[in-house]
Structure formats: structure tokens, C-alpha cells
């Protein structure tokens, strides 16, 4: 069984009352692996910065499905993705808290979602 802990996600300062956290699974923040993977790719880093801007201004009313959407076809209804171009950031939305889980690419989306769903089984706050 995975062990979950959270820490404040300091890269986001939401203007609308949402609080963003890192979701650590067994002391690992999966999102860090994605950031490491794109560190030498300026286009992907730019898209990630765009997603951080979306997170800063996030409110359910503001963002269209082209930037933020619920992940369909999984048992959990609280898994969402922020997206810009081919870059995805997967989160769990439990208002007013948003837990950043992982990042990925559109081309690997199905595989990423399956992996995330498996790894967050049992996560509740």
C-alpha cells in the first residue's frame, strides 16, 4: 500500500482561494521526474510555465476544457489535467485543495493516466 504525504506547492499562488499541494507517494513527487525530463527542452518548459499561469488564475469558471478538463473513463471523478500544447499536469481536485500528482505528454496520456490511477489508489483527505 502506498503512503501519501503532502507539501505546499510553492510554484503556484492561486488568486481564487484554491491551495495547491504536492502529492508525495512513498516520499516521491512524480511531477519532479517530469520536470527533470523536460529541463533541456525550451518549448516544453514554456508550456509548463503556461500551465503554472493557468494554476495561478484557476477557478472552475475561468478555464475552458482546452486548458483544464476532468479525466473520463476512470473510477475517480476528482482527477483532472491542466494542459498546454502537448504538455499535461495531472491533479486531484478536492475543493479548495488541488494536489499536483504528475506531468506527462499528450502522446503518453493513456499510459500516464493508468499509472496515476493505480498509484493514487487509497488517497483520500
Role assignments for model-derived ranges:
Residues 1-86, 95-98, 106-125:
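Basic, Lys/Arg-enriched alpha-helical interface segments
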Amino acid at each position: 500500500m502506498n503512503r501519501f504525504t503532502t507539501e505546499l506547492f510553492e510554484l503556484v499562488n492561486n488568486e481564487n482561494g484554491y491551495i495547491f499541494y504536492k502529492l508525495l507517494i512513498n516520499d516521491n513527487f512524480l511531477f519532479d521526474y517530469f520536470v527533470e525530463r523536460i529541463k533541456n527542452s525550451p518549448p516544453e518548459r514554456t508550456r509548463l510555465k503556461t500551465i503554472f499561469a493557468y494554476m495561478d488564475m484557476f477557478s472552475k469558471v475561468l478555464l475552458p476544457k482546452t486548458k483544464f478538463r476532468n479525466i473520463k473513463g476512470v473510477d475517480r471523478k476528482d482527477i483532472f489535467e491542466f494542459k498546454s500544447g502537448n504538455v499535461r499536469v495531472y491533479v486531484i481536485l478536492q475543493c479548495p485543495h488541488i494536489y499536483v500528482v504528475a506531468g506527462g505528454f499528450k502522446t503518453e496520456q493513456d499510459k500516464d493516466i493508468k499509472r496515476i490511477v493505480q498509484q493514487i489508489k487509497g488517497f483520500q483527505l
